[in-house]
Design a protein with these regions (language model features):
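A conserved beta-strand-loop-helix scaffold within acyl/acetyltransferase catalytic domains
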Residues: 2-59, 65-76, 121-152, 156-280
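Short amphipathic alpha-helical segments with coiled-coil-like heptad repeat character
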Residues: 25-26, 321-324
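Acyl-donor binding region in acyl/amide transferases
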Residues: 70-148, 264-316, 320
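Short functional hotspots where side chains directly engage DNA or cofactors
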Residues: 315, 325-327
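Alpha-helical membrane-targeting segments
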Residues: 329-331
Length: 331
């Protein structure tokens, strides 16, 4: 096996590794080269700090990939913690143990880093342990700890909506139904709108507007640069039916919206916003329930609420997934 490094951003496309993302159970939208390329173009600090890394087998076939960025003398997975929930390598499952060993063996030969701060590694995926063990074997000093916002609740979905409801504790099932009935009783029938090519721009405008109306840190998140990133995500992934912008319309008003991704059997809730004028009727909660229903109808087996240990996520029956961080230093 051979490890190849590249500092050329053109290799996001020239060495496209989307097939490896799909082959790896750890692969997510955040590992796709199209997502990482977009992140790099919008948030990359300096062009010469990119380090794309590929593993090739004896036949020269690409079997694994990981994108890094270097900040001073620290090596990090590419992807900011504010917008990238999971990070790290992807590869063919049968090669991952060897890839982890060869990766560290190649990295220690480089003199452009002293420490590695590797975030976004889910505890229930092999890469966390493989990278930790391989770094130890290479004589590096390794520390494992919780990542920032290091809990990502998720649901395992049954084949039907009724099956999902029946899988919940009675109290949660009752609350989901009660919120929808209360919204209809007090505001009239609601409608779920999923953005398509024609409606995307005005719906994104409304989503950004609602986001900036939020209280606290959420209200200042959607700065112009972040808005551009979200719009570029939509433009890149809506045609592939990966990007999902959903609204709940009540009384002729778009009361709440969610942005998510539908990717390889997993539907993810990436961001949300709601009109505070409707807060007492919880349209956002009703909308998330409808997002789950839509995911089930589309055959998804997982609904990932992503990082952030917020109480509302558990009202849908989610269970926590820990997301870990490896801090690796040269001795």
């Amino acid at each position: 096996m051979r490890v190849v490094f590249s500092e050329d951003a053109r290799d996001f496309q020239r060495r496209d590794w989307t097939d490896l993302v799909r082959a790896d159970p750890a692969g997510t939208i955040f590992h796709r080269p199209a997502f990482l390329k977009l992140y790099w173009e919008e948030f990359g600090e300096t062009p010469d700090h990119l380090l794309l890394t590929f593993a090739e087998d004896e036949d020269g076939r690409q079997v694994a990939a990981v994108a890094f960025e270097r900040m001073d003398d620290t090596l990090r997975f590419l992807g900011g913690t504010e917008v990238t929930d999971y990070m790290g390598p992807v590869g063919e499952p049968s090669t991952q143990t060897q890839v982890a060993k060869e990766l560290w063996a190649a990295l220690v030969q480089r003199d452009d880093w002293r420490s590695a701060d590797l975030r976004g590694l889910p505890e229930d995926r092999p890469w966390l342990g493989l990278l930790r063990e391989a770094a130890n074997e290479e004589g590096l000093v390794v520390r494992e700890e919780d990542d920032q916002n290091g809990i990502a609740p998720f649901l395992t979905l049954p084949p039907t909506w009724e099956g999902y409801l029946e899988s919940l504790p009675a109290k949660l099932r009752h609350e989901i139904r009660r919120k929808a009935k209360k919204l209809e009783a007090e505001a009239g029938p609601f409608r779920i709108i999923v953005a398509d090519r024609d409606s995307l721009e005005p719906l994104l405008d409304r989503f950004v507007e609602l986001h900036r109306m939020s209280e606290g840190p959420k209200g200042v998140f959607m700065v112009p640069g972040m808005e551009i990133f979200f719009r570029r995500l939509a433009a890149a992934f809506l045609p592939e039916h990966v990007f999902r912008l959903t609204f709940i319309e009540v009384g002729g008003q778009l009361a709440a919206g969610t942005i998510g991704f539908v990717c390889d059997g997993t539907s993810s809730l990436y961001n949300s916003a709601f009109d505070r004028a409707w807060g007492s009727l919880a349209p956002g909660m009703v909308l998330v329930a409808e997002d789950i229903r839509l995911a089930i109808d589309e055959g998804c087996t997982v609904f990932d609420l992503l990082k952030g240990d917020y109480g509302y996520k558990y009202r849908f029956g989610a269970v926590p997934r820990r997301v870990r961080r490896l801090v690796v230093e040269r001795p």
